[in-house]
């Protein structure tokens, strides 16, 4: 897209946004016409790598993630706690967390850290990175001095999927991976497709609605912030969990 002569801007836009830009007389050159197909093609080589992957272009499906966590927890119960339920999503799926520490079932006087992932449903790599980090901690505990120190001197909490409904929706429309739905699945009168929902990352209380640049009041926009702060059960669950702990750091 050209802003002024000699200046070009690369943007990721929806079909509706493309139509809007064209209606304003803005010149567009489409570099990647189908992001879903692009990501599926780009991710395919990873299938040959020598570590356990999921069936959705290497990413775990919702069911696979739950199964894989149960397997890891059963193998390493000495440092991985059982899951705790923080709340339910719009479509009544569990939002859950677990702790990695040397005494995972005890509340020790150690600094707490929170890791979260998949606030945006189309960003599965965030969940996969967390999951493999946990797997690394478990497998190297007692062998790697730095990782062992972390486990022994921190209480590390993980919420692998904040937005389960959006993630399952992407799985339903693109079972081979590459689904581009971003928001949760609240009915915002925008149809049943990817325009539906609230952007959970814009629904938290801090700075909510400060402007219409970083978030949108339009229910069909990808950055729709909701009718007010913390309207969504997913953000409420994260808020309440954080208020019940004293996290020193949060990696969101």
Regions found by a protein language model. Give the residues of each.
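M14 metallocarboxypeptidase catalytic domain recognition
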Residues: 1-252
